Amino acid sequence: RTALAFNDNGTKEIGQIATRLNLDLDYRFTATERLHAFMRPLDRNGNFSRCEFFGNDETGCDSVLNANIEAFFFEGDLGAIVSGINDNYVSWDLPFSIGLMPLLFQNGVWVEDAFTGLAFTIPAMNSKTLDITNVDITFFAGFDDVSTSGVVAVDGSSTEDDVNIYGVTAFVDAMQGYWEVGYGYTDGQDAFDDSDYHNFTFAFTKRYRNKISNSIRFISNVGQNLVGRSETADGYLLLIENSLITSKPSTFIP
């Protein structure tokens, strides 16, 4: 991504061009198993490599290099692996991933993070009786690089190393809509041991007359019991999202 801009902030004027590079790297073992890595070598902590070349306050070029690996994980299908080892067809699928992996649930409102852990999914279930066309259930756990503002020390500092997370979420196509329910347990370790709490999530999304898409989301944090201080993860969020449906719903959403 590259952007050209002139910023006039009253006391400061800068014209600049800035860029960001996303690198997705794959090594495929089979059609269903691969190693994946993701890097952003030209930006770090919200600062982009850029050149300031006009304006009263231009300072030249600044390279913001970043050698950190943002994601590195293995993913595959246990059913396909078992089939290959035994040289026999199996009728079940169990996709999984392990490593530093990005996960997104509830449109990023509940979870949007890359942490070190594992996840697996029981896919493609259905029920004619309940009018359910598809159900996917995903179990996940994270043991490092878990970011949450709900786990803080007495001095207010946060951590990504002393927090574990365990959860399950289900995606259900039913009643001509899309349901998403989930549960998570955030487990603080060592100095953050009293910061544990539970998460409950629910969402329903549906299109109406092919004109508007509506989502209703509910997310709750409960059960935290900090010693001698106020809770940092105690409350709920009710969010209503609306968007118009266009002729290109995958690329243009007003």
Language-model-detected regions and their locations in the chain:
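Signature for the C-terminal beta-barrel architecture of outer-membrane proteins
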Residues: 77-80, 93-95, 101-253
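"Short basic amphipathic alpha-helical interaction patches in structured regions
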Residues: 14-15, 51-53, 87-93, 110-117
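Beta-barrel outer-membrane channel/assembly domains of diderm bacteria
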Residues: 1-83, 125-129
